[in-house]
Amino acid sequence: MSQSEAMTQVESSKPYTIFTLSQKALIVTIISFAATLSGFASNIYFPALPQIADDLSVSTSLINLTVTCYLIFQGLSPTLWGSLSDTKGRRITYICTLVVFLGACIGLAETRNYAQLLVLRCVQSTGSASTIALGAGVLGDITTREERAGYMGIFQGGLLMPVAIGPVIGGVLSDKMGWRSVFWFLTIYGGACVLVIVLVLPETLRSMVGNGAEEPKRYAMSPLALYQRKKHFRQDTNPSAEGEKPAPKRTDFLGPAKILFHWNTFCAIFYVAVHYAAWQMVLTAVSVLVKQKYHTSEIQVGLIFLANGAGSIIGTVLVGRFLDYDYRRILRKYGGDEQRMPIEKARLRTVWLWSALECVSVLIFGWTVDQGVHISVPIICFFVLGWAAISLQSVISTYLVDIHHTQSASATASLNLVRCLLGAGGTAVVGPLINSIHVGWTFTLLTGIMLVLGGLALVQIMFGDAWRQRREHNSPSEMEGQRNV
């Protein structure tokens, strides 16, 4: 046996991660808690918009511009933080982003004019939006392909909780204590999140700690990790484990852009981003449409959003479990050889189902609201839309982390960039579209666009494996990282 073969055999016997199931559960809970900040900061704000416009003496259109700007920075900021976390560590990046978020929330609670509101909402988005990409990076560090989708489903379900309850909390706070209380709530919530991360979350970046057995730099140590290391880690490690840790990488702020324009990811990202934009356009239009057609109150509008949130949470948990089951089933057909198994077949073959459900729910929602059909029908469509849309997002997110395992945060940031920019554009035009061609035809147009661009998914499934193998052949370090997943 050659020396290289012996080293490979030794490395293959090492666990991918030393974190136990209970420790993984704790880590996933923490990153899901952090990811809710982005959703809360976005959704809790909507019920307060009319009150803010009156208090600052500006038009509703100008207040709506703060929503568009928030989405733009929500797409841009993870490209910075994601690249940093892939090289400097997850913990320090989490702490930096949340400090920015807390400062913005305090400033927003004390803002006195529209200019301050607009600028600070952009800063707030810069701090909160990256928690999703960072969470995906942590999941890539501690999970294997066979279990990743299940954990991704739990993570996605946690971060979608604010979609369901954010508008309700925002409506109650702004109604009882004024719109500034919304930002004080976010300050307290964000402060609790920072405290948990500082005290508990361990560093997971594999280029720093390998499978978790290596001691990170002092600034990356958490008190809990230090205690666990003294109690458990030393007995599980030995000098030969050094080979497990990947070589450190330089920070590449263009990393997300490079991932975006890889042929083996561009089609998947653009495909799911269009579906995300359609989803956001429906979410943006719902409150105005149901008030006009069904004469609902603000509280009733907030309760309608619960249907979408419930569908999203249920969908992401179930699709994660299904993806793990399906992956293991297909892997058995290839004799357990992950290098021969086409990951596109294992991950993407259900996208047609979720896309079809989203298209049907958008179409029926549009026409039932347009014709004033009983409100229960659009509410059911709203539930199905949340289920289908987030299931599709979870499928693509898991796939991207699988094929860009060594740059998982950057890969998620590239997805976030495209879908947030398209979402910002969509939310800006949905109102004028409805005014121009009416509700039913607006959502018919959205459905048609999603159907036409379904060809991108077909291209990804047909050619993705060949493109990925070509990229790995041209980048030996990336290929080695994938082998170690």
Task: State the predicted function of each range.
Residues 147-177, 181-193, 308-316, 416-426:
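Glycine-rich segments within core transmembrane alpha-helices of 12-TM secondary carriers
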